[in-house]
Amino acid sequence: MVSPDRDKWRSTLLAGQLFKAMQMSELDAILALATERQVRRGQIIFQKGDAGSSMMAVLTGRVRVGTNSPEGKELTLDIIDPGEVFGEIALLDGKPRSADATATEDSTLLVLGRREVLPFLMANPDLMFRVLMVVCGRLRQSSVALEDLALFDLPGRLARVVLKLADDYGRKTGDGVRINVRLSQKDLSNLVATSRESVNKQLAVWRAKGVLGMQGSSMILLDRAALEELVGPGRELS
C-alpha cells in the first residue's frame, strides 16, 4: 500500500490525463489499492508476452514503451512521464503484454493490480470511461506512427517527433523553443525506427540550415515552419 506517501503523490497524479478529473476521495481509494515499485535506469519493467496483471503510473522518472521487429530493430511507441499510466490494456483484458516497458531514468511507479482495481473501475463508470479514453489515445498514437512509417521518409518522421517533443516539453527562449527532455540520439532513432547514424546526419543537416540548435545537452527548435513543411498541413502529431 502507498498510504504513507499519499499526500506526496496526489499532485503528480492529478496532473495526468487519467487522474486529473478525479475527486480526492476517488484518488485516495485508488492509492489505497496500489503499491509502489522502484526501478533503476535501464531496468526492464515488463516485456511483450509477459502475463498482464496490472496497470502502472509513473510517479517520478520516465518510462519507454516500445517493441522490437523480427530483425531486432527497436521502435519506441510512447514515452511515459510522471502522472501518466501504461499497461492499461492488460488491466482491462488480463492478456499478455503487447509491448515492452523500460525505465529510461531511475523511477518510482504506482502499481495498480487488476484483481484489486478492476472491481473498483466497474463500480465507477466515469473512471472506467477515462481509462478507455487513455486506450483510445494510445491507439490513435500508434496509428499515426504506423502511417508515418508507411508514408514518410526519415526527415518527415523525425520532424514529426521533434515537433511533438517541442509541444510536450518545450519552453520558449529568446532564440526559439528549448526542448527540456533528456533523450539520446539512440532514443530518437528508436522513435523513428531507423539507425542512430541516420538520425545524426539529419540533425546535422538541420543544424547547418539553422533549423535546430543545441544549448548544452538540450535541443533548440529555431525554425518550426521548416519542420511543419515536412510534416504537412493539419498533420496530427500525437
Predicted regions and their residues:
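Cyclic-nucleotide recognition modules
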Residues: D78-R140, V144
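Short aromatic/basic micro-patch
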Residues: A21, M55, I79, V111, ...
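Cyclic nucleotide-binding regulatory module and flanking cytosolic helices
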Residues: M1-R41, A90-L91
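Cyclic nucleotide-binding regulatory domains
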Residues: L18, Q43-D106
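Residues that scaffold the ATP/ADP-binding catalytic core of kinase and kinase-like folds
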Residues: G66, E88-I89, P119-F120, V161, ...
